[in-house]
Structures are given as C-alpha cells and as structure tokens.
Amino acid sequence: MKIITCYKCVPDEQDIAVNNADGSLDFSKADAKISQYDLNAIEAACQLKQQAAEAQVTALSVGGKALTNAKGRKDVLSRGPDELIVVIDDQFERALPQQTATALAAAAQKAGFDLILCGDGSSDLYAQQVGLLVGEILNIPAVNGVSKIISLTADTLTVERELEDETETLSIPLPAVVAVSTDINSPQIPSMKAILGAAKKPVQVWSAADIGFNAEAAWSEQQVAAPKQRERQRIVIEGDGEEQIAAFAENLRKVI
C-alpha cells in the first residue's frame, strides 16, 4: 500500500518581526518549518504502516525555495516517511489553495497512491480547503476533521470524526483523501537515530513541468500588518464625589 502524507513549509512565527514604521509583518528572517497540523498527518501515516502489510509512506510537498533546505528535508524524513518528493517552482511561493491542490493532485498521480493524508489546514493561513480540493480534483472520496483512524484494509479506511453532539464513524473506500485534526495524535520528537537515518532516505525533486503543471498567476497582493497600538492617556480620577463620577462617565463615553 502506498500512503502519501502532504505537508506545507510555513514561516516560524517566532521569527516574524513587525516593522515599526507601518506595522507590516517582516518574514525575511523567518526560518521555514513544517506546519504544525501536518505533523499530525505525518505521524498518522507512519502509524498506519503498522496496520498495512508492506505499506510505504511518501512525504509530499509543493512550494518555493523553502523546500530546497536540507535541514527541512531531514526534519520531515526523520519523522518516519520512507521517502520524500518535493515539487519546487517559484510559482508556488504564493499559490492559492486551488493551485496548491491541483499541483498536489498531479504529483500524487505521478507518484501513485492508495491513500493521501494531510492536516486539516496550515499553520499560516488555515484555509482548510486543500485536502478536500485534492479529493475533488482526483474524483475520489475526501473527508476532513478526522480525529481517529480505527482500521485500514486493502480497500477501506474506517475513521471517526468528533461532531458537536456525537461521534461519527465512517468507512471510506480507497483510494481516498483524509484530512486529520490535531486530536488524532501527539507527534513524536524524532530520536537521534531517526535523525541520522533520515540522511540516507531517498529524495526526489520535481519541477512544475515534471507534473504537467502550468497555471497562470491567480493571487492578489494584500497587506498583512500588526494591529495599531493605541497610546494610553493614563487619566487618573481621584475621589468619589459627584464631580469625579461625572468626569469618569464623560471619559468613558469618549471610548465607547
């Protein structure tokens, strides 16, 4: 069985700075990391290897220059996948969910798969669209919000979803796309042995042309800025007489 687990490289929020001049966010010094939600998908895929005979897990990502980072590749492979496929092209730097899903679907078809796992959303945008779009593009079942995988056979995956007032159990025919929630597991921290072994695992680097992808730019430039900080006036009203109460009420009306 071939299991693909998709992931996205996102900026490390600890490295994002705010420009004091205009309040815009500066990502120039932010290192890339695996989206937190995709760590759950990677962990789930590797746990499924224990349920499926001769299962192989392939990590897959599409993106820009962040995917060229050797440290980032090793981080992914140290978490259990048997191999890594990255599709690198400048046009993926600002791809919208539709373009990302189209590229992932094309890459998955080229690689071959029985099951595709991904996180419910990404740590940076959390659009919660890509997984379902991949299923739609491939014309296969797609389920999101999965909080537990019960069993896996050669042709069926049984999962649970936590709804508002009940737990839903679904049997999904394969091939399929499943987007998992953070409730599904707690991603393990790779051991030193796993980190060293990651360097020996195969990595395939594809271009957009390799998967037959050539989309026109479909994004719009928007400003991302920190909220404006309002300077406190530090008005202190001393006393509890009628004049002080009236002054307090007047100042309160100014900010409501």
Curated annotation (Swiss-Prot):
The protein's UniProt keywords, in alphabetical order, are:
Electron transport, Transport
Q: Which SMART domains match?
A: ETF (SM00893)
Any one GO MF annotation of this record: electron transfer activity
Q: In which pathway does it act?
A: Amine and polyamine metabolism; carnitine metabolism
The chain's coiled-coil residues are: none
Q: Does the record bear Transport in its keywords?
A: yes
> Among the record's GO biological process terms, what is one?
carnitine metabolic process
Q: Does the keyword Electron transport apply?
A: yes
Top-level taxon of the source organism: Bacteria
| Cited PROSITE patterns | ETF_BETA (PS01065)
Family stated for the protein in its record: Belongs to the ETF beta-subunit/FixA family.
General function of this protein: Required for anaerobic carnitine reduction. May bring reductant to CaiA.
Q: Which HAMAP family match?
A: FixA
Complex and partners: Heterodimer of FixA and FixB.
Which protein is depicted? Protein FixA
Query: Source species, please?
Result: Escherichia coli O17:K52:H18 (strain UMN026 / ExPEC)
The gene from which this protein is expressed is: fixA
